[in-house]
Amino acid sequence: MRKSQVYSLVGALVLALASLAIVPPRANAQGPGLVSSIINRMERNRRDLRSLRAGIQMEKYNAQVGDKDMYFGDVIYLPTAGREASVRVDWQKPQRETLSVSNGKYTLFRPRLNMAYVGATNSSRSKVSGVLGFGLNVSQAQLRANFEPLQLLGEGVLYGNVHVTWLKLVPKGKASYKYAEIWVDDNGMPVQTKVVERNDDSTTVRLVNVQRNAPVASDEFQLKLPGDVKKVNG
């Protein structure tokens, strides 16, 4: 497997748009007032969020060939100081893999190959926590400083039972992606995030069965690899 493929997966972490019913914003809900209230709810969620466990679904879309890959698994998340966060994803389908990001480093373990890719979460690889961090670990001040005024795209119901508001985030200045979209529930939790790259490829991540502030120990992010695992530095 080429390193670029590894970095692509490490940089992925985002999921599917299936079963999303969105309607335009109600006339009496339009304008900066509603967007401001959503940002305030997101800020409260960020402040109060000490940990997270959830199911995770990811869709990676290749715009050049019109193809997409789907991934399913479980995620744990532990915010830390600044924008860094500890993230672990245990993929179950289509193949079993574990990705852990903590203390500025990542490990991607592929049991079927008996191989682990390790490296620093800089450059494109920092997206691992960054995609989730669009809403989970970014402050109100950072949202206002780093993005154009947030655009309200609509409201709707995700998977039949989660009411969400749909926002578009366009970065100020130069960025590695064109824009991001987030779907925020009524408690200010971003339950779905989509990042569209400059070549129109996209990665969408969705959290399901979210458990806010569930017990998560810091040592859960330290992978205990078998002694015979081959490590490849990224």
Describe these PLM feature segments:
Residues M1-S4:
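Positively charged n-region of N-terminal signal peptides that target proteins for export
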Residues A21, A27-A29:
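Boundary at the C-terminal end of the N-terminal hydrophobic targeting segment
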Residues V10-S19:
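Bacterial N-terminal signal peptides
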Residues S37-N40, R44-L108:
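N-terminal mature ectodomain segment of secretory-pathway/periplasmic proteins
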Residues R50-L52, Y71-G73, A85, Q95-E97, ...:
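Envelope-exposed proteins and targeting segments
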